[in-house]
Amino acid sequence: MNTTITSKDEILCVCRELIRKEGYKSINIRHVAKCCHISVGSVYNYFESKTDLIAETVASVWCDIFHFPDNRNPESDNPDSPDESKIFQSFPDCVAWIFDRLKQGEEKYPGFFSLHSMGFIEEEKMDVQERMDRSWFHIRQSLVVVLKNDANIRSDAFDENFTEEDFAEIIFSLILASFVQHDFDAKRIFNMIRKMLY
């Protein structure tokens, strides 16, 4: 058996491929070790338990689905620098990109979204949820950044009682509801955004 050290990222890459081809149930320490051509102990060097491995794999899948290429990271935008190119021309462009990524994610990882609807298995649910929340945090932050950079939004759209953060949270909740329902048609959300912001 090849016992050379394998990086955590390489193991997670194999786990993503397993989820894609064999489904969620294929993620266990022994099977992952076999597919990585490493010892079971080597997997435990990076993951304390099966729960830890599954939670990290789920977070890794979400990061793969919503990975911003280097030139499309909204958090790298400096709103005080007008010369810096913006990644999205408008907030609806950003939401369209998210829906497109969800659709591609469903195609790349068939059945993955259904796992979230079912809540995974009970003993792993909390840890997976916490890591999923962390991996989604950057999406919510990105929505806020894009809102603040969209020069076409009405000047009176936001105030101290209804902030960009509040609106981003509402839109994110609608996006999550759409993904749970496997509804990747964002037309109604776009209509709401246009009526409220422009």
For every predicted segment, state its role.
Residues 1-6, 70-79, 157:
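N-terminal intrinsically disordered/low-complexity leader segments
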Residues 10, 14, 18-52, 56, ...:
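Helix-turn-helix
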Residues 12, 66, 92, 96, ...:
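Short, amphipathic alpha-helical "lid/cap" segments that border enzyme active or binding sites
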Residues 56, 70-108, 164-168:
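Hydrophobic alpha-helical connector segments
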Residues 60, 64, 101-109, 146-149, ...:
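Phosphate/oxyanion-binding loops and surfaces in catalytic or ligand/nucleic-acid-binding neighborhoods
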Residues 93, 97-141:
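Short secondary-structure transition hinges
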Residues 116, 171-175:
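Short alpha-helical scaffolding segments that buttress acidic/His motifs in well-ordered protein cores
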Residues 124-129, 133-168, 197-198:
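Hydrophobic alpha-helical bundle segments that form small-molecule/ligand-binding pockets
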